[in-house]
Amino acid sequence: MKPERFASISRSGALLAINLLFLMVWGFTGIGKLLAGVPPWFGDKFGATFMAKFPGLTAAFWILAISEVAAFGLAALALVTGEFAGRRAPQFLRLMLVWSLFVFVQLGFGQWLTSDYNATAQLFAYFAGTLVALIYVEGRTESGEQTVSKI
């Protein structure tokens, strides 16, 4: 197998794995929130924070749920359009990864508000992993030229 072909197959496999990972993460969390609604513990955990006043606990929960479902939708679009195959630029995948960064900021902010610093640290790691995935996805131009070294 030619090195160029091997590199193309490897990149496609990595893009597919990134796409499937985030599809799974946001699918389970976002759709789970839509189906289950606001859990009973949500008020206990966040009721003493300013989120109880603004935007309100119910609104905060649904904003987060919609954010996660939006990330799931972008991941699904990236998969359905076959961006991992390399026939087109991974635009939906990039957008989903950038959106995911903001979702992790939302999640981390909530944990920080409740002084749950272990969970905040975990979310920081998820944020960092997402940033690494984004750098990898943006690592080549549409013509295949390497761009990571230019960052």
Kindly give the residue locations of the regions a language model identified.
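Membrane-interface interhelical connector segments
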Residues: 34-56
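Extended, low-polarity transmembrane helix blocks
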Residues: 1-32, 61-66, 70-151
